[in-house]
């Protein structure tokens, strides 16, 4: 399988997995027109859509795509049924698309019904984990998002994090501001700055790298917490997650 991405809106990525025959899977098609163009340019034939959550920038293109390709199958969590999901997935459910086995699992936080999909090495995690960051908590709690991160962190280290937005640089600006002396962070910040200056994408990320630079995955490290905010030393990882996300919201 080959991984590609289609830019949409200001910073969205619509992910595409295609086989050698040109059949493809689309993830979170928030708008249809850029997808139509990419399908024509690459001679792809879509057979399935995966939806991670109900927000319009992830589901807005579904209706038009199904109208043009009526044989397409749309998978998604219960909250996406009204957005066009035909097959509602359950936590821990496995299914096959284009010969690949996918695991659907619940990752609440950004929304209450958010799901992610894993087919090694690809993780399509929508707006749960971003490179060097996490999604805003529009519906869920910090504790829920923390547990979602724990599920993702249990995947193999060479998992490719295919998140839905190009937020890496803004996430790193925040992390470097609160932890300026971390060598892994500062090095990655320089690399990402160079990529974005050339209008190149920073995704997918790799879980092994995220374990080094994504502070939301390092909240059980007491030495790290001492550097960020010693007042959090006796707090739980969930409380630390809430504090860090709140600081980012107001950065």
Curated annotation (Swiss-Prot):
It is an enzyme of class 3 (hydrolase). One of its GO terms (biological process) is methylglyoxal catabolic process to D-lactate via S-lactoyl-glutathione. Zn(2+) 2 binds at residues 57-58, 127, 165. Keywords: Hydrolase, Metal-binding, Zinc. GO terms for molecular function: hydroxyacylglutathione hydrolase activity; metal ion binding. It holds the Pfam family HAGH_C. Zn(2+) 1 binds at residues 53, 55, 110, 127. Binds 2 Zn(2+) ions per subunit. It catalyses: an S-(2-hydroxyacyl)glutathione + H2O = a 2-hydroxy carboxylate + glutathione + H(+). Pathway: Secondary metabolite metabolism; methylglyoxal degradation; (R)-lactate from methylglyoxal: step 2/2. Disulfide bonds: none annotated. Its EC number is 3.1.2.6. Its cofactor is Zn(2+). PANTHER family: HYDROXYACYLGLUTATHIONE HYDROLASE, HYDROXYACYLGLUTATHIONE HYDROLASE GLOB. Monomer. Belongs to the metallo-beta-lactamase superfamily. Glyoxalase II family. Thiolesterase that catalyzes the hydrolysis of S-D-lactoyl-glutathione to form glutathione and D-lactic acid. This is Hydroxyacylglutathione hydrolase.
